[in-house]
Amino acid sequence: MSDNNKKSIAVLGAGPAGLMAAWRLRCAGFAVTLFEQEPVVGGMCATQTFKGRDGEYRFDYGGHRFITKNPELLAFIDELMGDELLHAERKSVIRFGGRTYDYPLNLPNLLKTAPLALMAGAVKDLLLLPFAKKPTDFAKASFAEWIQSHFGRTLYRQFFEGYTGKLWGINPDKLSADWAGQRISLIDLKDVARRLLPRRNGSISVRTYARKYRYPKYGFGQIFTTLGERLVAEGVELKTGATITRLEQADGRIERVYWKQDDVEQSAAFDQVISTLPLPLTCQHLGLPCDLHYRSLRFVNMPLKTENLSDNTWQYLSDPHILATRLQEPRRRSPFMAPQGQTSVMLEIPCNPGDATWQAPLSDLRGRVTADLASLGVDTAKLGDETFEARSEYAYPLMDLGYQARRNEAIKALMPITNLIMTGRQGTFRYIFTDTAMEMGMMAADMVIDGVDRRHAILNHRNENTVIETQSVA
């Protein structure tokens, strides 16, 4: 412990991975400085609180929930949060073409809701799928090819094509398929058929999303603010509002970390640097090239003067003419996300920095999404006139065709820096779940603690081609 105390560790970014790395390191006796650009910890998993006329409204940066198949991690979060960690159940629907479909799909709802042509096309696809040409290398396949080879063209056109294009901002035939196996719950059309057919005992054996999950009383970010408070109490130096500006390297090591806080640039030397910053930013701070990009989000959040909008946690909005991709009601996760007797809505709007949507005045966006909400059947007269917004510049790593080679080039350029560890969703440029990011943070800390190089293991952690949510113990 005394030797560890002499080693100083910089953790860049206080999201799930950075916080867990700092916790593990501090428990092992290391001196840890944790840097966070925002005023609060949590990164993309933070919760924002807005004070409206009728009370406080809380909004996450998207649809977060705590699920994991790691009993050790679950026990840690249970102990950390105690009675503040609630049990919740997810209910989701797909809105498309003026119809509302259950998600995941089920036969009674499809028979009641889907046009006859859709049902006929899906059955035809199922019969022809065994004879259809499939991509020979799914690592190089496009998302469009992957979906059609597993679901058939009819379901692809109905449920995936428009939504995916709107979310990622590129045509699905230009998007890589290598992440789909962990994110799409119906693995192939045979699974669809097994799901659609009713079971005698009512059970379903095919893979699907976890419906039950844990969620903090006051928003997902409460997990990370609570952990941040514990870290500070244990002696971690937490610097919020601190933007990393440069990483100085010499002889294969980062010698100094430079940051700006309160408009003053400062620097310090560290023995080891764990970076959860977006991978392109880490490269930029070291003067290295990196041709990787992100898809951004704007969130338009509005109070609603009614106790409940619906019983849906979120609604996928697949119609291309609707600006947002998801409509969420935070109160469905915890009743404490809105004042008593009221609720709120959150719309996720994909965009790119500098484009028309990113630059649009909030009043313009509100007008557009209000019209969209009305078309979805929401009583917009109950919205009032308050609007709260948030932005996430690095919401989704853009996994277009060929991104793997560009990611490998960036990682190869960083690997000679022996005291740098990239970890977490942003630091590894991976589209992963929160618990995986937390595990990556612990792995980075373990590398510092025992000196075993785990960088390649971290970069590929939980990269198996299976739906990760299906194995949740939370």
Model-derived regions: residue spans:
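Active-site/ligand-binding neighborhood in enzyme catalytic cores
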Residues: 115, 124-247, 269
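C-terminal lid/capping helical subdomain adjacent to the catalytic/cofactor pocket in oxidative enzymes
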Residues: 401-474
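N-terminal Rossmann-like FAD-binding beta1-loop-alpha1 element of flavoenzymes
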Residues: 7-34
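Dinucleotide-binding Rossmann-like beta1-alpha1 core, especially the glycine-rich loop
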Residues: 53-135
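Extreme N-terminal leader/targeting segments of oxidoreductases
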Residues: 1-9, 27-28, 470-474
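A short alpha-helix-loop-beta-strand transition element characteristic
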Residues: 47, 58, 73-95, 154-158, ...
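Mid-domain catalytic core of redox enzymes
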Residues: 28, 240-381, 408-411, 459-466, ...
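Glycine-rich FAD pyrophosphate-binding loop
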Residues: 26-51
